[in-house]
Amino acid sequence: DRFLPSMQQIFVVVHLIGKILYSFVDALGNDESQRFYATKGKYYIAEGQRLFRDRQQAHLQSFYSKSAEIFPRICVNMQRFLDAMFILFEMRKNEDLQFTQNIDQTFVTKAKLYIDKHLVCNKRSNGDIISYVALETCHTTANLFDNYLFKNTLNLFNIDHSLNQTSIPSTQ
């Protein structure tokens, strides 16, 4: 697709961004992202506890409880993806990239330059590079997770539905 980066381009840029620690609290102490994901986590835990008290399906309890653990990880992965997309679109805007082009050493060199120039990161005294997970990223992730990933997971592992389904005999 000439309008979107290839999966290879995205993967390479994510790799080139390298080892970055992501924080939900920015350098100025803004913790809106952290408060947002903590609130989501509390909701998932409360739902899991409610299902436990109501003696509802154990797998649902487990999914809700696990959601509290994985949601911040998905936020971080979404931020990495958005950072990579930002770099790729900056390269394209400045005519240093066509989304149909192959990855070669020139692409890698230019991508590294764009990462250094455009990706806003803070460096700690111990050398760790820190980037901030934006509140908007948490909102986007919540929308994707709640309305797609979580619902599809529940549908895939719906025990009530699968118990009422008859097995289709093998034709082999």
Task: Name each model-derived stretch.
Residues 1-172:
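Phosphate-handling catalytic cores of nucleic-acid transaction enzymes
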